[in-house]
Curated annotation (Swiss-Prot):
Localisation: Cytoplasm
One Pfam family from the record: Dala_Dala_lig_C
Residues reported in the UniProt entry to bind Mg(2+) 2: E270, N272
Cofactor dependence: Mg(2+); Mn(2+)
Cofactor comment: Binds 2 magnesium or manganese ions per subunit.
Gene Ontology molecular function, alphabetical: ATP binding; D-alanine-D-alanine ligase activity; metal ion binding
SUPFAM superfamilies referenced in this protein's UniProt entry, alphabetically: Glutathione synthetase ATP-binding domain-like, PreATP-grasp domain
Protein name from the UniProt record: D-alanine--D-alanine ligase B
Quaternary context: Monomer.
A Gene Ontology cellular-component term: cytosol
Origin superkingdom: Bacteria
Binding site for ATP: 134-189
Family the entry assigns: Belongs to the D-alanine--D-alanine ligase family.
Length: 306
């Protein structure tokens, strides 16, 4: 008898709609691969009852808080249910851009200069030291909540007088916010599947940066896979991504986003331990380039679950 698989989708985070699309695609792909899979939306179903409902494994197609941040992973561990993707600690660290950057920096890996602020600091009013640190980043900067995905709450700031509004928006989504030096690009993403690093993808958004609309709604965003890098550059990028991935303790599958600045240096942006699996999504695109169908990809991800 085959295992009964729960595909967790939807949820309650800011990325619910993306997750519903990801989950529907994953469900179809698993069923095409002969897997006995069923959709489960934690917003509507008590996921603490998954075991009593007869499920033996879980495919996590949730994005953002409550699905990608270690909390769900911890619950599944306590229940003794194998699940896809990274464990508790790696999921929590990857969801937290600030702590990811601190770990990467500590490991000697390249990250863009940044300033971190708490909501309390912002509401109190920034002191001269903080203002000087922000000023040292130059303009433009990118302002982002530390623990949101899909570019939710993110803004590019090109003029000093726009910074307050950008911070206000970011603080609507998190207690901690990053102000990062703007890197001119292009942006790359590299997917990891088990021990295999898939071909890199170069991302060319129509707008100024790769925001929520460019990721999920726009047909004008262009993706290049293979990315067009020279062999040595591709090898260097893959080596950097592998170090970034293992530094956070990630496993199973996921994605690391990287920027190539005008100085020819790669800089790590963030790790995604439960990436999108929609029609616009990048892991399926990289897998396709590596000769793997969508169904083969999701079945392989499930096989890696522990």
């Amino acid at each position: 008898m085959t295992d009964k698989i729960a595909v967790l989708l939807g949820g309650t985070s800011a990325e619910r709609e993306v997750s519903l699309n990801s989950g529907a695609a994953v469900l179809a792909g698993l069923r095409e691969g002969g897997i006995d899979a069923y959709p489960v939306d934690p917003k509507e179903v008590d996921v603490t009852q998954l075991k009593s409902m007869g499920f033996q494994k879980v495919f996590i197609a949730l994005h953002g808080r409550g699905g990608e941040d270690g909390t769900l992973q911890g619950m599944l561990e306590l229940m003794g249910l194998p699940y896809t993707g990274s464990g508790v600690m790696a999921s929590a660290l990857s969801m937290d851009k600030l702590r990811s950057k601190l770990l990467w920096q500590g490991a000697g890996l390249p990250v863009a200069p940044w300033v971190a602020l708490t909501r309390a600091e912002f509401e109190k009013g920034l002191n001269d030291k903080q203002l000087a640190e922000i000023s040292s980043l130059g303009l433009p900067v990118i302002v982002k909540p530390s623990r949101e995905g899909s570019s939710v709450g993110m803004s590019k700031v090109v003029a000093e007088n726009a910074l307050q509004d950008a911070l206000r928006l970011a603080f609507q989504h998190d207690e901690e916010v990053l102000i990062e030096k703007w890197l001119s690009g292009p942006e790359f993403t590299v997917a990891i599947l088990g021990e295999e690093i898939l071909p890199s993808i170069r991302i060319q958004p129509a707008g100024t940066f790769y925001d929520y609309e460019a990721k999920y709604l726009s047909d004008e965003t262009q993706y290049f896979c293979p990315a067009g890098l020279e062999a040595l550059q591709e090898a260097n990028l893959q080596a950097l991504v592998l170090k970034a991935w293992t530094t956070l303790g990630c496993k199973g599958w996921g994605r690391i986003d990287v920027m190539l600045d005008s100085d020819g240096q790669f800089y790590l942006l963030e790790a995604n331990t439960s990436p999108g699996m929609t029609s616009h999504s990048l892991v399926p695109m990289a897998a396709r380039q590596a000769g793997m169908s969508f169904s083969q990809l999701v079945v392989r991800i499930l096989e890696l679950a522990d």
